[in-house]
Amino acid sequence: MAEREEEGKLYLRMYHDVCMEHVSAALERVVDAAEIPLRRVSEEESGRPALPGGWSRKQVLGHLIDSASNNHQRFVRAALADALEFPAYDTPGSVRVQAVASAAWPMLVDLWASYNRYLVHVIRRLPAAKLEVVCRIGSNAPVSLGYLAEDYVRHLVHHLDRIGVATRS
């Protein structure tokens, strides 16, 4: 019985190493691929809507910084708990309250890139035993901590693609 338990722990560690290394490496590639194109955007261009009727690049990047901040807390708190509930996320309210549209574009790019590089570090070190911790965010269906990390990268790529920033190097 103890031997099977050890085999299970070994499998979980191997799964974690592959899964979280894949997620963190994907995030790192996205940041590396997107940072230079983001830095090439002028202050003026960053304030214009990327798509007709949509948010400006500043607002999108501000949202992604806020997403990094929210998910950082989710990753760390879930890794310290057996289950966790988080409040719903008010995207438009958050962008408005933080006055992202009046922030300097280079500062936003610096913060976005640095915060996401730190999240690469955090994701790589999430404990294997905590990847299945159940997380509830607002009224959404419960998901695992591992899923949150994977979905964070998908969300980031989606928004960068929407503002015309290539995420593949």
Descriptions of predicted regions:
Residues 26-39, 94-132:
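Acidic/histidine-rich alpha-helical segments that form the ligand environment
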Residues 15-19, 56, 97-104, 140-144:
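Short amphipathic alpha-helical segments at helix-loop
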Residues 21, 25-28, 58, 62, ...:
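A generic "alpha-helical surface" signal
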Residues 1-29:
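Terminal targeting/low-complexity segments that flank the catalytic cores of oxidoreductases
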Residues 40-48:
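Cytochrome P450 catalytic-domain "roof"
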Residues 2-13, 47-91, 117-128, 132-169:
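Short, contiguous alpha-helical
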